[in-house]
From Swiss-Prot:
Lipid-bearing positions (S-palmitoyl cysteine): 3-4
Similarity comment: family membership: Belongs to the LAMTOR1 family.
Function, as annotated: Key component of the Ragulator complex, a multiprotein complex involved in amino acid sensing and activation of mTORC1, a signaling complex promoting cell growth in response to growth factors, energy levels, and amino acids. Activated by amino acids through a mechanism involving the lysosomal V-ATPase, the Ragulator plays a dual role for the small GTPases Rag (RagA/RRAGA, RagB/RRAGB, RagC/RRAGC and/or RagD/RRAGD): it (1) acts as a guanine nucleotide exchange factor (GEF), activating the small GTPases Rag and (2) mediates recruitment of Rag GTPases to the lysosome membrane.
GO BP terms: cellular response to amino acid stimulus; cellular response to nutrient levels; cholesterol homeostasis; endosomal transport; endosome organization; lysosome localization; lysosome organization; positive regulation of MAPK cascade
Gene Ontology molecular function, alphabetical: GTPase binding; protein-membrane adaptor activity
Effect of residue 4 to A: Decreased palmitoylation
Gene name in the database record: LAMTOR1
Record has Ligase as a keyword: no
Effect listed in the UniProt record for changing residue 3 to S: Does not affect interaction with ZDHHC3
Name of the protein in its database record: Ragulator complex protein LAMTOR1
Species: Homo sapiens (Human)
InterPro entries named among the record's database cross-references: LAMTOR1/MEH1
Region (Disordered) residue spans: 1-43
GO cellular component entries: azurophil granule membrane; extracellular exosome; ficolin-1-rich granule membrane; FNIP-folliculin RagC/D GAP; late endosome membrane; lysosomal membrane; lysosome; membrane raft
Length: 161
């Protein structure tokens, strides 16, 4: 889309004008009347297209920034402080509601209160592991051989006229 270029002695009028357009906060964001994003493909040139896109990105970024250094907490009145606190609380509630799926996951089970003792103990003998594997294979084969045979119809038609 663009590149960063810096030169101390080369500064054309066009570069100054582009910098002024990008850094000018008084320019309104480019939105259509219905609130939809503007159609960048209908603009006559690619340069205007890039400028409009950069202006909209800059406007969105500027609207989402909270300047903490500009807020003087001593000069703020009580009702302004309460309004901001309410606004931040609603923003946090909206953001935290999208994270509810993380709260629904069950925590990992705690099988022991002293895992260091479990990890330091002797390993499970190989014969026990083989026996568990044989039992699991036997259970799998038994479950895979279960078949349901239909002996009669599941839906019986009654002779109701």
């Amino acid at each position: 889309m663009g590149c960063c270029y810096s030169s101390e002695n080369e500064d054309s009028d066009q570069d100054r004008e582009e910098r002024k357009l990008l850094l000018d906060p008084s320019s309104p964001p480019t939105k259509a009347l219905n609130g939809a994003e503007p159609n960048y493909h209908s603009l006559p040139s690619a340069r205007t297209d890039e400028q409009a896109l950069l202006s909209s990105i800059l406007a969105k970024t500027a609207s989402n920034i909270i300047d903490v250094s500009a807020a003087d907490s001593q000069g703020m009145e009580q009702h302004e402080y309460m309004d901001r606190a309410r606004q931040y609380s609603t923003r946090l509630a909206v953001l935290s509601s999208s994270l509810t799926h993380w709260k629904k996951l069950p925590p990992l089970p705690s099988l022991t209160s002293q895992p260091h003792q479990v990890l330091a103990s002797e390993p499970i003998p190989f014969s026990d592991l083989q026996q568990v594997s044989r039992i699991a294979a036997y259970a799998y084969s038994a479950l895979s051989q279960i078949r349901v045979d239909a002996k009669e119809e599941l839906v019986v038609q009654f002779g109701i006229p």
